[in-house]
């Protein structure tokens, strides 16, 4: 049996198990537990499917499955791309008892989840993350969305999968950059969690990340457990769940300014974490030692901690962030590791000064 651990995400209306597996073995058994599935649709990227097709075919050979390909990259996760996928599902005869399998990274998971949440007013789906970033973040919690011309994840919903199946063996094919991107979210979760988790993250570096290491399952499980606890208490992001946006206000501005071409999401989050911590020093009395330790950890994992993008340009793009209220830019800040605060209004001048200070570190 390839099961390593199952972490439950308990929400008001549903309990979603997150299964951490060493490989794809056991996926078909989990699908078989779902009642009344009439057909299965795999939504994935061709580049991902070509690597794992033989393993998927072997594992899912007993299922009536059809594959729908989408293009890779954040640009493909656009509202304009949904129509062709809806049409394919209609053409293939997908009904309300059909099941969608989202096999890929965060883009595939977000896109396929959004399709599942809206097709026939909602059909079941399963998250099968193939990147470290998706394993610890986007596949867990039920957020699904697509992008609009003027913003990331502007059109979406909260829609829980039937389960998450994370096969760690697929991570072995990830390029170094993808490993590092996932680590940015792990660092974020450890800062929010504090305690032993934060201390553990600080003592490791990029060279420790591989599918055969003992630390990797620990880091993933702790991240999933932390996020599961947050989501369980606030599924719809009306309060506590907002803390998971630590670093993301700056990150989304960076991605938007560069049109998703220069920085990966994880790299943008890494830079955004430092911006948030510098603002935390000013607005929530964070000890500067935490900022220094975070920068050191980012370096150890090969992640950026500053950008050459213009401070004013980034601040301008933050005005369009979906977390804003009444035109006020809202940040998640940190009082100390394990003690985040959210919905903190920050004026553009302070943001510009923080990013400017960040450039000089």
Curated annotation (Swiss-Prot):
<protein>
    <recommendedName>
        <fullName>3-dehydroquinate synthase</fullName>
        <ecNumber>4.2.3.4</ecNumber>
    </recommendedName>
</protein>
<dbReference type="InterPro" id="IPR050071">
    <property type="entry name" value="Dehydroquinate_synthase"/>
</dbReference>
<dbReference type="GO" id="GO:0009423">
    <property type="term" value="P:chorismate biosynthetic process"/>
</dbReference>
<keyword id="KW-0479">Metal-binding</keyword>
<keyword id="KW-0547">Nucleotide-binding</keyword>
<feature type="binding site">
    <location>
        <position position="185"/>
    </location>
    <ligand>
        <name>Zn(2+)</name>
    </ligand>
</feature>
<feature type="binding site">
    <location>
        <position position="248"/>
    </location>
    <ligand>
        <name>Zn(2+)</name>
    </ligand>
</feature>
<feature type="binding site">
    <location>
        <begin position="106"/>
        <end position="110"/>
    </location>
    <ligand>
        <name>NAD(+)</name>
    </ligand>
</feature>
<comment type="function">
    <text>Catalyzes the conversion of 3-deoxy-D-arabino-heptulosonate 7-phosphate (DAHP) to dehydroquinate (DHQ).</text>
</comment>
<dbReference type="GO" id="GO:0008652">
    <property type="term" value="P:amino acid biosynthetic process"/>
</dbReference>
<dbReference type="InterPro" id="IPR056179">
    <property type="entry name" value="DHQS_C"/>
</dbReference>
<keyword id="KW-0862">Zinc</keyword>
<dbReference type="Pfam" id="PF24621">
    <property type="entry name" value="DHQS_C"/>
</dbReference>
<dbReference type="GO" id="GO:0009073">
    <property type="term" value="P:aromatic amino acid family biosynthetic process"/>
</dbReference>
<dbReference type="GO" id="GO:0003856">
    <property type="term" value="F:3-dehydroquinate synthase activity"/>
</dbReference>
<keyword id="KW-0963">Cytoplasm</keyword>
<feature type="binding site">
    <location>
        <begin position="130"/>
        <end position="131"/>
    </location>
    <ligand>
        <name>NAD(+)</name>
    </ligand>
</feature>
<keyword id="KW-0028">Amino-acid biosynthesis</keyword>
<dbReference type="GO" id="GO:0005737">
    <property type="term" value="C:cytoplasm"/>
</dbReference>
<dbReference type="InterPro" id="IPR030960">
    <property type="entry name" value="DHQS/DOIS_N"/>
</dbReference>
<dbReference type="InterPro" id="IPR016037">
    <property type="entry name" value="DHQ_synth_AroB"/>
</dbReference>
<keyword id="KW-0057">Aromatic amino acid biosynthesis</keyword>
<feature type="binding site">
    <location>
        <position position="265"/>
    </location>
    <ligand>
        <name>Zn(2+)</name>
    </ligand>
</feature>
<keyword id="KW-0520">NAD</keyword>
<dbReference type="GO" id="GO:0046872">
    <property type="term" value="F:metal ion binding"/>
</dbReference>
<keyword id="KW-0456">Lyase</keyword>
<keyword id="KW-0170">Cobalt</keyword>
<dbReference type="InterPro" id="IPR030963">
    <property type="entry name" value="DHQ_synth_fam"/>
</dbReference>
<comment type="similarity">
    <text>Belongs to the sugar phosphate cyclases superfamily. Dehydroquinate synthase family.</text>
</comment>
<feature type="binding site">
    <location>
        <position position="143"/>
    </location>
    <ligand>
        <name>NAD(+)</name>
    </ligand>
</feature>
<feature type="binding site">
    <location>
        <position position="152"/>
    </location>
    <ligand>
        <name>NAD(+)</name>
    </ligand>
</feature>
<dbReference type="Pfam" id="PF01761">
    <property type="entry name" value="DHQ_synthase"/>
</dbReference>
<comment type="pathway">
    <text>Metabolic intermediate biosynthesis; chorismate biosynthesis; chorismate from D-erythrose 4-phosphate and phosphoenolpyruvate: step 2/7.</text>
</comment>
<dbReference type="GO" id="GO:0000166">
    <property type="term" value="F:nucleotide binding"/>
</dbReference>
């Amino acid at each position: 049996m390839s099961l390593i651990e199952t972490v439950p995400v308990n929400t008001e209306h549903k309990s979603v198990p997150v299964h951490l597996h060493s490989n794809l073995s056991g996926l078909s058994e989990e699908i078989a537990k779902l009642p009344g599935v009439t057909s299965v649709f795999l939504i994935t990227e061709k580049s991902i499917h070509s690597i794992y097709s033989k393993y998927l075919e072997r594992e899912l050979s007993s299922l009536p499955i059809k594959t729908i390909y989408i293009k890779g990259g954040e640009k493909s996760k656009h509202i304009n791309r949904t129509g062709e996928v809806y049409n394919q599902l209609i053409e293939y005869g997908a009904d309300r008892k059909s099941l969608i399998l989202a096999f890929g990274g965060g883009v595939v998971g977000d896109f396929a989840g959004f399709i599942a949440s809206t097709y026939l007013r909602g059909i079941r789906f399963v998250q099968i993350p193939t990147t470290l970033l998706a394993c610890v973040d986007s596949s867990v919690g039920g957020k699904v969305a697509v992008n609009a011309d003027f913003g990331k994840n502007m059109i979406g919903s909260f829609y829980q999968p039937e389960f998450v199946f994370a096969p760690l063996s697929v991570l072995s094919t990830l390029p170094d950059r993808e490993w590092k991107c996932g680590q940015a979210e792990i660092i974020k979760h450890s800062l929010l969690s504090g305690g032993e988790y934060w201390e553990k993250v600080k003592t490791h570096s990029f060279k420790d990340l591989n599918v055969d290491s003992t630390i990797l399952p620990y880091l993933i499980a702790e991240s999933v457990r932390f996020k599961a606890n947050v989501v369980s208490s606030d599924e719809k992001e009306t309060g506590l769940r907002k803390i998971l946006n630590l670093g993301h206000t700056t990150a989304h501005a960076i991605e938007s300014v560069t049109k998703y071409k220069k920085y990966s999401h994880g790299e943008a989050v890494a830079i955004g974490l430092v911006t948030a911590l510098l603002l935390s020093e000013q607005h929530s009395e964070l000890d500067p030692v935490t900022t220094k330790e975070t920068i050191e950890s980012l370096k150890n994992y090969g992640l950026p901690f500053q950008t050459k993008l213009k401070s004013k340009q980034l601040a301008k793009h933050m005005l369009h962030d979906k977390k804003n209220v009444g035109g006020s830019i809202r940040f998640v800040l940190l009082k100390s590791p394990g003690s985040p605060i959210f919905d903190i209004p920050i004026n553009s001048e302070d943001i510009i000064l923080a990013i400017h200070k960040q450039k000089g570190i």
